[in-house]
């Protein structure tokens, strides 16, 4: 079943519902009503708005006023052809699907997005961890004689020792470092949470660089951001996600690491990976990462074990005749 979509005009276009002409539905009214109905954070609302505008622009440039399920499948294929990652494609399709679900529920329109799946996600992670050697080189490369170096060292050191997400570090305030039972804890607002009700433990090696940085900043007020901008325009303000990513990317590039798979988020992967290599149990690593599902943590363990116990080495040993390096061997080979 097809129907005339809202079009891409501020005045709106007539909408057909089961062959009957309904009232005009202006684009901005529909978008605003849909977005306001979503019980999500402001950043998610903005993502929904951008995603829908992208879809509606795609319809407009093709002169499509009667989209069908095939239209959405074609849109999905177009996203693939444009080289978007499976993660990005899925995000766009989820937004379109939510919008048509809402239109069905609130306007009685046929849901042409029902059953449309996102792109098949690759197994594993989209970012790689740093090696222990790279971590040491990265930290040693930072000149801490000036404030920028003190901040960047404290920040990167915090990431690789605690597994914080970038947004968690950005949201942190000076007052969020508190003592409990003789230990320093950093209370954080975790992913998808409204309060700072999770924490990471700050060892002496993690805490000392932070205090050195804060002292050099002039002992900021408790409610001040833990890590602040040093730009002329926004000096003292909270770092943005973009700025933080740029800082870390720049530090990585300074030691010759320039890969799309090694970014700010890699530091979180690094901490979780190092914890397992250091002997942490799966449950301990899950607590560090604050993974809701232990299966996510198991991916890290699987990757470590897969490399450590790689059967490719046994094949090499067999072909080269070094059978003494192989355990049980089938003598009929």
Features from the language model and the residues they span:
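Conserved catalytic core of the tyrosine transesterase superfamily
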Residues: 2-333
């Amino acid at each position: 079943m097809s129907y005339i979509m809202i079009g891409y005009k501020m005045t709106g276009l007539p909408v057909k519902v089961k062959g009957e002409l309904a009232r005009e539905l202006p684009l901005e009214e529909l978008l605003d009503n849909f977005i306001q109905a979503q019980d999500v954070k402001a950043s998610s609302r903005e993502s929904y708005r951008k995603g829908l505008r992208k879809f509606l622009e795609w319809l407009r440039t093709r002169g499509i006023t009667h989209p069908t399920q095939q239209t959405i499948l074609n849109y999905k294929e177009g996203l693939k052809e444009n080289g978007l990652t499976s993660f990005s494609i899925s995000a766009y399709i989820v937004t379109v699907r939510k919008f048509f679900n809402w239109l069905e529920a609130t306007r009685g329109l046929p849901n042409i997005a029902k059953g449309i799946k996102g792109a098949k996600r690759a197994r594993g992670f989209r970012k790689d961890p740093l090696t222990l050697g790279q971590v040491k080189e990265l930290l040693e490369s930072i000149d801490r004689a000036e404030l920028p170096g003190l901040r960047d060292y404290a920040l990167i050191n915090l990431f690789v020792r605690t597994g914080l997400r970038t947004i968690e570090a950005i949201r942190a305030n000076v007052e969020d470092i508190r003592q409990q039972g003789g230990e320093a804890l950093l209370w954080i607002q975790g992913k998808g949470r409204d309060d700072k009700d999770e924490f990471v433990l700050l060892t002496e090696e993690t805490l000392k660089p932070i205090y050195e940085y804060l002292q050099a900043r002039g002992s900021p007020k408790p409610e001040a951001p833990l890590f602040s901008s040093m730009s002329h325009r926004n000096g003292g303000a909270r770092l943005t996600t973009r700025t933080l990513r740029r800082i870390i990317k720049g530090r990585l590039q300074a030691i010759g690491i320039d890969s799309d798979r090694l970014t700010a988020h890699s530091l979180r992967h690094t901490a979780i990976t190092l914890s397992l290599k250091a002997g942490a149990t799966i449950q301990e690593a899950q607590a560090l990462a604050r993974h809701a599902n232990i299966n996510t943590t198991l991916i890290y363990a699987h990757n470590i074990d897969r490399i450590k116990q790689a059967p490719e080495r046994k094949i090499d040993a067999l072909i080269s005749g070094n059978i003494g390096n192989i355990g049980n061997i089938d003598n009929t080979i």
